């Protein structure tokens, strides 16, 4: 199953820009699946997939910011009071 790049976009989250790559692939049964790679850093990516491009775009808009915020919180060092 080969992925075909169908679109590259920039996604802005809190003033920072992340590159996204949208792919289409055919399953063994011949149906289409869509996936998106959100490039957070050189070695850190979020990969999401869905049955339709419309629902994938909605999923990326909802989950990419949540992932960025959670990773930002996880990287902070907390001092117990």
Model-identified regions with their sequence ranges:
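A structural detector for beta-sheet-dominated domains
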Residues: 14, 23, 39, 59-61
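A short, structured beta-strand/loop element
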Residues: 19-48
């Amino acid at each position: 199953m080969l992925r075909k790049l169908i679109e590259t976009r920039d996604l802005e989250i809190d003033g920072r820009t992340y590159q996204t790559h949208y792919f289409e692939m055919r399953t063994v049964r011949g149906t289409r699946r869509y996936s998106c790679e959100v490039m957070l850093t050189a070695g850190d990516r979020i990969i999401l997939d869905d049955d339709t491009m419309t629902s994938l775009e909605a999923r990326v808009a909802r989950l990419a910011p949540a992932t960025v915020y959670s990773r930002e919180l996880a990287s902070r060092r907390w001092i117990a009071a």
